[in-house]
Amino acid sequence: HRVDRRQRQMCIRDSDKGLFVLAATSNPEAQTLQRSVSETGRAVSADIILVVSARNAEHSEAGEWGSFGFVIGATVDWTDAGIAAFAPVAPVLAPGFGTQGATPADLHRRFGSMSPAVIASESRSILSAGPAGLAAAIDARVAEYREAGRG
């Protein structure tokens, strides 16, 4: 059963939920599409952010975060991806911290003014501590993110 655009919009509006849209991931196989230039002359990643940000602006009160967020890899170079800070602020799910290369100290450097909206995602680096060391690994990483947030 195919859902048309009007039905999708009604479902989104009536559900009062949010979602994350893939915008600029660090997956090598996605870069061909996400970094390609669309008919607008911008990178597809930039177009995704512009369209979703416009939707967020239309459906959010002034000063509120948008309910549609973005997946932007923690190791993605924003300039190379053709993206920049966006408004209204929306959550950013950022996989790639830990084993994949980004550190808590990179959070502000990589995400700039958007860093307060970032949900830093890492798992392998924490899970590598094993069952006995898991709680200590989580506590240590939380302390690193708190310290990075003060900087």
Enumerate the predicted regions with their spans.
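Short, conserved active-site loop motifs that form the nucleotide-linked donor/cofactor pocket
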Residues: 8, 68, 118
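C-terminal alpha-helical cap/extension of soluble enzyme domains
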Residues: 88-151
